[in-house]
Amino acid sequence: MPRPIHAVIHQPALANNLDIIRGKAPESRIWAVVKANAYGHGIRRVFAALRGADGFGLLDLNEAVLLRDLGWQGPILLLEGFFQPQDVAVIEQYRLTTAIHCDEQLRMLESARAKGPLAIQLKLNTGMNRLGFHPAAYRTAWERARAMPCVGSIVHMTHFSDADSARGVAHQIEAFDAATANLPGEASLSNSAAVLWHPQAHRAWVRPGIILYGASPTGRDADIAGTGLQPAMSLHSELISVQDLQPGDTVGYGSLFTAERPMRIGVVACGYADGYPRHASGWGEQRAPVLVDGVRTELVGRVSMDMLCVDLTPCPKARVGSPVTLWGQGLPIDEVAQASGTVGYELMCALAPRVPTSVATITASDSAAPAVA
């Protein structure tokens, strides 16, 4: 028998989250962002649930080709554009939309001799200072793109740096509107946080990412409470050992946890080689939460490569074989991430290939049935 650890990708949750996003931005078309292999969920696993989107956004040409192989005929956006002149031929062959964010990409496009018409999204740097043309150079970049015979539609695009914070998006919208004034073309501004909290930024296209998968753009689950968003990934395992500790006994490498009273702990078949964060806290004031037999408890000690330990005080009936939820439905991934000094995005993307993953599928009655993927 294999180790009991396994992950589940919940297609009904993905479809639910897409519906909620549609309700938040009813006048906008949706790029479902599936970069990083759908934030670790797997493009193959999420495709059926997200094909109601208007397009898919990603980074990798191979992932774009995979979507075409899965039967997707709609738009696919390369969010970082292309990296070599020869990529333009692949973009043309597979009918991809590409971002253009720098002079080098414009030069490559000019020299590629594509037949077109190519759909491009010209990226404006409104303050993120990562990718995009500065406002003073944007109109010139647009005119260069417009003059290329291979270029068809041009969408104006930017990315928000503070849509999930008190600073907000007003300053970036102002810069965007000033730089694109009197230029024809649709606009795409909103990331997940702007979809939820800044309707003035929705425009023609929105680009939700993390909220498709049921986690919070801020890293705080409380911030999406009441939205109806559901976690699309659950990570489960079982107890493989139970230990009885006496006061003064320590747990794990570095002896970071010391028992202050007689207590039982459980050993879970999950470690950092499975994608669980080694820096998850099992000592001090904020210990990482875990569910054992559906009961909330906490980590004790340091996470090892293949195992971690949990306090069984709240779970007196727990024994070897008791089910454990590391994150997912019933335990928000953002809570685990907060206790690990990171964000839910990272935990999703870090799920290790060695973890068997199944799919809870969408059936005709909208009920979930597990299927291995």
UniProtKB/Swiss-Prot annotation:
Active site annotation, chain numbering: 35 (proton acceptor), 253 (proton acceptor)
InterPro entries given in the database record: Ala_racemase, Ala_racemase/Decarboxylase_C, Ala_racemase_C, Ala_racemase_N, Ala_racemase_pyridoxalP-BS, PLP-binding_barrel
Taxonomic path: Bacteria, Pseudomonadati, Pseudomonadota, Betaproteobacteria, Burkholderiales
HAMAP family in the record: Ala_racemase (MF_01201)
Catalysed reaction, written as an equation: L-alanine = D-alanine
Record-stated family: Belongs to the alanine racemase family.
Pfam families in the record: Ala_racemase_C (PF00842), Ala_racemase_N (PF01168)
Any GO MF annotation of the entry: pyridoxal phosphate binding
EC number(s) stated in the UniProt entry for this protein: 5.1.1.1
Biological or metabolic pathway of the protein: Amino-acid biosynthesis; D-alanine biosynthesis; D-alanine from L-alanine: step 1/1
Any one GO BP annotation for this protein: D-alanine biosynthetic process
Cellular component GO terms, alphabetical: cytosol
Obligatory cofactor(s): pyridoxal 5'-phosphate
Record keywords: Isomerase, Pyridoxal phosphate
Protein name per the record: Alanine racemase
Residues where substrate binds: 130, 305
Chain's role: Catalyzes the interconversion of L-alanine and D-alanine. May also act on other amino acids.
Signal listed as a keyword: no
Species the sequence originates in: Cupriavidus necator (strain ATCC 17699 / DSM 428 / KCTC 22496 / NCIMB 10442 / H16 / Stanier 337)
Modified residues (N6-(pyridoxal phosphate)lysine): 35
TM region(s), chain numbering: none
Top EC class, one word: isomerase
